[in-house]
């Protein structure tokens, strides 16, 4: 079994780290460079910066934040938000990022995945998916013909891809989209459950497992981490390759090292 990764996520708005619940009610959580240094010292395997307003508003000062972080932190850094072109990839990589995450632009312009992977390498291209459960009220609905339906304790649902920071549904089935981005050349999928986001009730294991079983790409589980057991569950039951978390680290409820110790106790390989 490959070593599992623990990845702190920093949602950045106007140069500050913020955290919300279900993609809303954002609260300030600190300075991105300072938090990055703390997580680096705690043993984080990677960091993810998501400029959460950039796809919807104009790009802010994320390049400056990336530069300042890359000067002081020496673990892989993934940056996403407002990346629309190959030139945007180039600018963020030059600022010090190791990987680029695309979400809205991948859905709007799928060929960007292919172009970027051919120029910069597949390892550089992370496709982020914001996904929400779409519960079925009418099983005979014609629109369900091309959807992957799952039974959950709350009822039957399919998983819908959202764009623009979770503001707009696309009607695209998440399983089918994951398979498509793999073919186009993505190197990794950052999979966020909008239903679980910020709740601290655990990752959406049905979603995570469904995507993990359908593609060969590494899957980063995101949304809902509230304790170390949730991370273990994401690896064991969700079959994720990495776990992303924010709130529990930002508000110092635990450290990266605490999480890794619990994962190791469950005979899951991690790097210290």
From Swiss-Prot:
IGPS catalyzes the conversion of PRFAR and glutamine to IGP, AICAR and glutamate. The HisF subunit catalyzes the cyclization activity that produces IGP and AICAR from PRFAR using the ammonia provided by the HisH subunit. InterPro entries: Aldolase_TIM (IPR013785), His_biosynth (IPR006062), HisF (IPR004651), IGPS_HisA/HisF (IPR050064), RibuloseP-bd_barrel (IPR011060). Keywords: Amino-acid biosynthesis, Cytoplasm, Histidine biosynthesis, Lyase. It catalyses: 5-[(5-phospho-1-deoxy-D-ribulos-1-ylimino)methylamino]-1-(5-phospho-beta-D-ribosyl)imidazole-4-carboxamide + L-glutamine = D-erythro-1-(imidazol-4-yl)glycerol 3-phosphate + 5-amino-1-(5-phospho-beta-D-ribosyl)imidazole-4-carboxamide + L-glutamate + H(+). It comes from Methanococcus maripaludis (strain C6 / ATCC BAA-1332). It comes from the Archaea. It is found in: Cytoplasm. This is Imidazole glycerol phosphate synthase subunit HisF. One of its GO terms (molecular function) is imidazoleglycerol-phosphate synthase activity.
